[in-house]
């Protein structure tokens, strides 16, 4: 989610937009990121955490690839909105998973989640920086897709369904 603000100027130039238009696109994407979290409690109970997180990562992977090949404002906007919606799955699902999985060490588990979340937030602008420095804005989204392709098998292997398993002792 932090890729777009880091590349406002490049997006303005590439799509011949002004700052307000890019801000509007990011605002809509951010809104979708927030609102997309709402149905997750129902979907969590129906499908479980592993399926939802894998679905989220697959969606982020393909949406990021769509953003990376965007040649029009419409395609960029719609694929970014999809990216925001798929990304919105993570927080409600992972926090619920933590609360169901850990008994004694829930605070420690949430702390680890927060640390890695902060790393993720700081990686967005860093990925943008190196992409813009050495390639183009498109590559920031390609790298995001690659990262999700790398994380996907790890999620499939290590995310439990919902059994209690306090593993951070």
Regions picked out by a protein language model, each given a short descriptive name:
Residues 1-19:
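Extracytoplasmic
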Residues 2, 30-38, 121-122:
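Residue-level signature of mid-helix packing/kink "hotspots" within the transmembrane helices
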Residues 16, 48, 69-74, 103:
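Helix-breaking motifs and short loop linkers at transmembrane-helix boundaries and internal kinks
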Residues 63, 74-82:
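Paired small-residue
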Residues 80-117:
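Cytoplasmic helix-loop-helix junction between adjacent transmembrane helices
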Residues 112-159:
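Helix-loop-helix hairpin linking two adjacent transmembrane segments in secondary transporters
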Residues 156-169:
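Flexible cytoplasmic inter-helical loops of multi-pass small-molecule transporters
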